[in-house]
Swiss-Prot record:
Superkingdom per UniProt: Bacteria
Enzyme class (EC, first level): transferase
UniProt-annotated stretches for the region Alpha N-terminal domain (alpha-NTD): 1-243
UniProt cross-references to CDD domains, sorted A to Z: RNAP_alpha_NTD
Role noted for this protein: DNA-dependent RNA polymerase catalyzes the transcription of DNA into RNA using the four ribonucleoside triphosphates as substrates.
Record-stated family: Belongs to the RNA polymerase alpha chain family.
This protein's UniProt keywords: DNA-directed RNA polymerase, Nucleotidyltransferase, Transcription, Transferase
Name of the featured protein: DNA-directed RNA polymerase subunit alpha
Keyword Nucleotidyltransferase appears in the UniProt entry: yes
InterPro entries linked to this entry: DNA-dir_RNA_pol_insert, DNA-dir_RNA_pol_RpoA/D/Rpb3, DNA-dir_RpoA, RBP11-like, RNAP_asu_C, RNApol_insert_sf
Amino acid sequence: MLIKQGERLINARNWSELVKPDQILREEETASGTHGKFVCEPLERGYGTTIGNAMRRVLLASLQGAAFVSVKIIGVQHEFTTIHGVLEDITDVILNIKQVRLRMDTEEPQRLTLRVERKGPVTAADIVANQHVEVLNPDLHIATLTEDVVLEMELEVRMGKGYVPADMHEGLADEIGLIKLDSSFSPVRKVAYTVEQARVGQMTNYDRLLLEVWTDGSLTPEDAIAYSAKIIKDQISVFINFDERVSGDMRNGSGESGEVNEHLFKSIDDLELSVRATNCLRSANIGLVGELVQRTEAEMLKTKNFGRKSLDEIKGVLLGMGLDFGMKVDSFDKKYQEWKRKQQNEA
């Protein structure tokens, strides 16, 4: 499985022969809009900890979310004071405000208001949202009015990531009465992972990663792990110093000279694949390599009894022939018949 790129020889076995998970499964028994437990197996020994730790760090620190960045309470000049008719002092009110969880569908800062004139509890449901912002925990207690007084405030919401101290927010005016807030933007509240043994055939020296994610409801656990995986992929791809894809002129089944790659006309029986992989291809009515390479990886994984291990096995063989899945082979049937006639004439 050696691929020549210019003067370099790339050994694709370094990655093509590693065990990879067939898919990520979610345990439905405990699933909800804010909690998910995911199973990823099989993995090479040690990869469970490597992937689990990286995913946990990114999940907790790097995902975008919405949070309040400032509040202006009418009649209050600073946070170290009280309001007549309000049971809590301003510090406690602010702590409660920072617990409000939000979903926002725009990157532009939004201003929300709250105005209550009745005696009794004030909750997040009293915040007047707009078409871009949704309050996810409306039952959250904010304050208690002990008299028929007016509690009025203006709040600014922004998108961000991680934890941002109050003095680190950009563009907030330094005006009297505007209280800047420490903001926790992360939509992920908690992450835990464990690594267990996994079996592949008779071998048990593989990893099984259990990843558990809790969110605030503004992002589903599935999307949270998908975004985190994308972040990691984008960050580490810069280390790859070769073209891991088949070159562009090979994508249509032609070699550098423009000649049709004759490997396309091989029977799958000549590829020396495992019995399982060969049987899966036959059940999918694939008899020639040229028919195989026109299928995408996603299409192949939908084939009955066809898993990631078979996919990786076949992909490695194809790469060794300068081919890959998802190739465009124009008029393959016609080219195949022409090739057969040519072989017969030469015989």
